[in-house]
Amino acid sequence: MTDQPSSIALLRLMAWLSPAFPVGGFAYSHGLECAVHDGLVADATSLANWLETLVKMGSGWNDAVLFCESWRRARNAGDLDEVAALAEALAGSRERHAETMLQGAAFLKAAAAWPNPVLARLPAECAYCVTVGAIAGGNGIALQDALSAFLQAFFSNLVQAAIRLGVVGQSEATTLLAGFEPLALSTADRASRSTLDDLGGCAFVSDVVAMKHETQYSRLFRS
């Protein structure tokens, strides 16, 4: 498979991971809304710690591993249905499941604007990290570039959620995003050398608040 020139790869990543790409990411907080409600995240420092934990040892790390596995299987004609089923099984709550599956299906539909054989190899209902990873691989985009952009978009979406929840303002948000760049790059490097045996995590509080959010009385987000 021929790799895309870096300029084309950059343009595609900017389009696919833009807030304007129609996957509905603005509707999800990944449990952050409940963490704010419970006082676990209250300012820029606690928000940074929360998001770093997700990517180092929580759902963000698992998504990175699954992204890489999907990228590799897209490149070598591997079984994408298997990794898609695993990713779905790892969604630990009803709302986390909806968040990843609905965004994945929306991404698959929208990415049809860039025709590629990998689209037909993905199940119609597929976790977001698997869909993006496989389509990036199928389009010849370098793994670490694609995953770094995916992780930074993950940070960006949750920082935007934090703004709407009143935790940080615009200036603090941009400072946080700039500060997350080294973590996105180092995590992409680490995950690029991972296998499915590296799946796992210990961000249990994040998983608990994702479940608690299902019964939260007043809320802005779907997760």
Curated annotation (Swiss-Prot):
InterPro entries: UreF (IPR002639), UreF_sf (IPR038277). Pfam families: UreF. Keywords: Chaperone, Cytoplasm, Nickel insertion. One of its GO terms (cellular component) is cytoplasm. Coiled coil: none annotated. GO terms for molecular function: nickel cation binding. It is found in: Cytoplasm. It comes from the Bacteria. Belongs to the UreF family. Required for maturation of urease via the functional incorporation of the urease nickel metallocenter. UreD, UreF and UreG form a complex that acts as a GTP-hydrolysis-dependent molecular chaperone, activating the urease apoprotein by helping to assemble the nickel containing metallocenter of UreC. The UreE protein probably delivers the nickel. This is Urease accessory protein UreF. It comes from Mesorhizobium japonicum (strain LMG 29417 / CECT 9101 / MAFF 303099). The lineage of its organism: Bacteria, Pseudomonadati, Pseudomonadota, Alphaproteobacteria, Hyphomicrobiales. The gene is ureF.
